[in-house]
Amino acid sequence: MGTNKPVVIGIAGGSGSGKTSVTKAIFDHFKGHSILILEQDYYYKDQSHLPMEERLKTNYDHPLAFDNDLLIEHLQQLLAYKQVDKPVYDYTLHTRSEEIIPVEPKDVIILEGILILEDPRLCELMDIKLFVDTDADLRILRRMQRDIKERGRTMDSVIDQYVNVVRPMHNQFIEPSKKFADIIIPEGGQNHVAIDSMVTKIATILEQKVNL
């Protein structure tokens, strides 16, 4: 493990943009190396104090839904090579689970989430900021597939949420945050040229750390 500060790579983009695919492609290339993924999705605010009817009204695409204070605290601890206990969010109960996931510090941290570029405090902690930019029609199709398959949602509920919440929030918060990115990746996980470029960049960073 290097003695200097870990490198933080931020990967942002709208829901269904392919940012998770980009993250996984980069991470899989470096399996066995000193690299970790920290997902903003795990840092939704605890809502255990609220009744279920209130939790169901949560707008998960709004910046205020995230506990960025805790995310920043954990990121700062990882930057100091300290272990953190990552929270787990229960989407069926719409609140934070009692489960935690211990995360060991690594030399390269991939921070992934829809709104990580929206918070200037998070941007300040990133060395490289990426925005995965994908056509809106493709994003909604991917979101429908995910929510129906993985979260037990109906097609009607997914479409209603997209029209009334996801699309407005994307236009208001996520799309404007694109201007803070150092690199914009069109077509998400299908953009092998961009992914290969990032792999080369990270490989250089890891090699420099080994030679310290």
Swiss-Prot record:
Question: What are the recorded Gene Ontology BP terms?
Answer: CTP salvage; UMP salvage
Q: Does the keyword Nucleotide-binding apply?
A: yes
Source organism of the structure? Bacillus anthracis
- The domain of life is Bacteria
UniProt protein name: Uridine kinase
Which reactions does this protein catalyse?
uridine + ATP = UMP + ADP + H(+); cytidine + ATP = CMP + ADP + H(+)
The cross-references to PANTHER family, in alphabetical order and at most eight, read: URIDINE KINASE
Q: Which amino acid positions bind ATP, per UniProt?
A: 13-20
Tell me which InterPro entries the record gives: P-loop_NTPase, PRK/URK, Uridine_kinase, Uridine_kinase-like
